[in-house]
């Protein structure tokens, strides 16, 4: 399958892409149901994800495809791809290689938990750093 945007499959048209041609994506660990991260995909990224069974996102800052783990080795093997009821959010059920999904070296990007009250609360890191980011991105 080619991923030239002119020849992408018709099933991609069911997804409700935003004005920038992107759709939000949630990566969830298949074995534990832990929410690992949030990212974006364009049509090419979603097609590549289906084709390779590895998570491929679209980096808005780099304006290019981002093959999860291309620098860190922390790839996501895709077990299942789902589309929500409004057809505007994609869920990937993945196996997270090495257990690290976040660029901070943690298991999940959602490692900060709100504790306290509206008047006196704060975000607290509740997941440990599994690997120093300095050693992940050399």
Swiss-Prot record:
Its main location: cytoplasm. The keyword Cytoplasm applies. The keyword Ligase does not apply. Belongs to the PRA-CH family. This is Phosphoribosyl-AMP cyclohydrolase. Catalyzes the hydrolysis of the adenine ring of phosphoribosyl-AMP. Zn(2+) binds at residues 85, 102, 109. It comes from Burkholderia vietnamiensis (strain G4 / LMG 22486). One of its GO terms (molecular function) is zinc ion binding.
């Amino acid at each position: 399958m080619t991923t030239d945007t002119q020849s992408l499959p018709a099933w991609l048209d069911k997804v409700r892409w935003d004005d920038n041609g992107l759709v939000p994506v949630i990566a969830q660990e298949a074995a534990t149901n832990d929410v690992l991260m949030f990212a974006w995909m364009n049509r090419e990224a979603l097609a590549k994800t289906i084709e390779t069974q590895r998570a491929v996102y679209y980096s808005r800052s780099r304006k290019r495809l981002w093959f999860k783990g291309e620098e860190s080795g922390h790839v996501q093997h895709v077990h299942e791809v789902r589309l929500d009821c409004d057809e505007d959010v994609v869920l990937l059920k993945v196996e997270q290689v090495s257990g690290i999904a976040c660029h901070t070296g943690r298991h999940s990007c959602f490692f900060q938990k709100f504790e306290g009250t509206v008047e006196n609360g704060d975000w607290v890191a509740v997941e440990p750093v599994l690997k120093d980011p300095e050693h992940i991105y050399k």
